[in-house]
Regions:
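Conserved catalytic alpha/beta cores of large enzymes that bind or transform nucleotide phosphates
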Residues: 191-280
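N-terminal beta-alpha lobe that positions the nucleotide/phosphoryl donor
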Residues: 1-166, 175, 250-275
Length: 280
């Protein structure tokens, strides 16, 4: 999952990664075992006799998420998260830094199934109490209708799943997006594809806006394709915590989101990451 990959990039490469920490998969199992949730969840899941029945699926998932959110996290686990957040605050010389809390499920990267992107991410989270709550919300997001349906169809045991929550310093980006070390439009592994949009990256990941698309040749490190798409809205931080949607200024809506220099800098990081993992 992303927790281990981010840790590896932080310690073994010079690719810039926002500081942070992660709860472990063991912490998730500890939470559901110490509180008796595992047996309660097993009982609720037993009622899911027909995953194609959307009403039944939704009802079961609502109850699963509710059971998790209603259950207080064990105090020692809360204390461990609080200490890690305070250590991050000390490292960043901030009292209560704004962070992103992201889900990293142990089932994300099985060879015959793709579970990635099925759990939730929370941005601009402020204060230890909110971090603890959002970690629990990440746990609950393992049981959205979509995630449960997919695991059922894959024959994956819901109670074998575990989740690590990644807590990273929030980056208040003017532009953000995703990057691939292959051109996903045609499968060409000699090119890097970068997609970017104004604001925070969740609108790109969620398909809410159509990002700009840039293609860079790996060998020559030259920009070979630029596709600029009009963007009329973006997601930004809300003062005090959380996020909000605002209009993109009229003058910027048809402009290229990233400069050519930024695109090539990002492509350089992509090559380093690919080389580190031995993919190219």
């Amino acid at each position: 999952g992303k927790s281990s990959s981010l840790g590896e990039m932080t310690s073994k490469t010079d690719v810039p990664v926002p500081y942070g920490f992660a709860t472990t998969a063991h912490a998730y199992r500890y939470f559901i075992d110490q509180t008796g949730l595992r047996e309660k969840m097993r009982s609720i899941l037993a009622e899911l006799t027909d995953v194609e029945n959307s009403e039944l699926l939704s009802s079961v998932c609502v109850r699963l998420r509710g059971a998790i959110m209603e259950q207080e996290m064990p105090q020692d686990l809360q204390d461990a998260i609080r200490r890690a957040y305070e250590e991050l605050a000390h490292k960043m010389n901030e009292d209560e830094p704004y962070v992103a809390v992201r889900s990293s499920a142990t089932a994300e990267d099985l060879p015959d199934a793709s579970f990635a992107g099925q759990q939730d991410t929370y941005l601009n989270v402020h204060g230890a109490d909110q971090v603890i709550r959002k970690v629990k919300e990440c746990y609950a997001s393992c049981f959205t209708d979509r995630a449960v349906y997919y695991r059922e169809k894959q024959g994956y045991d819901h109670l074998s799943l575990a989740l690590s929550a990644v807590v990273q310093m929030m980056v208040f980006s003017k532009a953000a997006g995703v990057m691939f070390t292959v051109n996903v439009a045609n499968g060409d592994d000699k090119n890097i594809m970068i997609e970017g949009a104004y604001g925070l990256g969740e609108y790109v990941v969620g398909g809410i806006v159509t990002p700009d698309s840039y293609v860079v040749s790996k060998d020559e490190m030259k920009l070979i394709s630029v596709s600029v798409n009009e963007q009329d809205k973006m997601l930004i931080r809300k003062p005090g915590g959380d996020t909000m949607e605002v209009p993109v200024p009229e003058a910027d809506r048809r402009k290229q989101t990233l400069t050519n220099a930024q695109i090539l800098e990002l492509a350089g990081y992509a090559k380093k990451i690919e080389a580190h993992y031995g993919c190219y």
